[in-house]
């Protein structure tokens, strides 16, 4: 859906995309979206639909929104596949509405909130809408934006879609599995006994299992045994280390 500066809906765009590499939808997708194979057979290919969407949506000050950046990730993957480009070049500004709206939701968890649950918390009815279909999901997003819009706060969530944005978007985090990795540091295992505060002594070799490095230790002062667990996750911004010390009984 397209909104003007007063958040009034001015136009809608809706189109299926005909898949190139498969002719069948799995049962889960059918049940979730209520889309069937016949809908897709009549559709145009990705490049054609993207061109039509560009004509519908382009503008110098257009800000594109979606509920989480998953749609941007999928769009970028398809642009790489069919256009040999990281992105659709007419999409220059983008905001993740889910991240923005979470500021206004009363929730005790940091987990992502679904669009339908967010709409319910904002008192927005989804009656008569077909959820998980792009056009109706966009209508819910528009209503959530209307309910929460604050010019200053929202501006902080608008991203310019440059190369750095797409490098971050497409980066796949992974766990370090080798001691030869530059982010593996043996000194991370240097811990003190929680009871007497004396340095622990290693009693075995470092082992690795299911993305976790472990090593057993002994406190020679109070004769307590421990195991240290180290997990290293590589993210776009660098390595994140999680170190846990367990006392062995």
Where on the chain are the PLM-derived regions?
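Active-site-proximal helix-loop-helix substrate-binding element of RNase H-like nuclease domains
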Residues: 24-26, 30-33, 37-40, 100-138
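Short aromatic/hydrophobic-glycine micro-motifs
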Residues: 35, 84, 123-124, 198, ...
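Acidic, Mg2+-coordinating catalytic module of metal-dependent nucleases/exonucleases
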Residues: 60-70, 74-79, 114-183
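Short, hinge-like loop/turn segments at secondary-structure boundaries
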Residues: 82-83, 112
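Acidic two-metal-ion nuclease catalytic site recognized across multiple nuclease folds
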Residues: 144-249
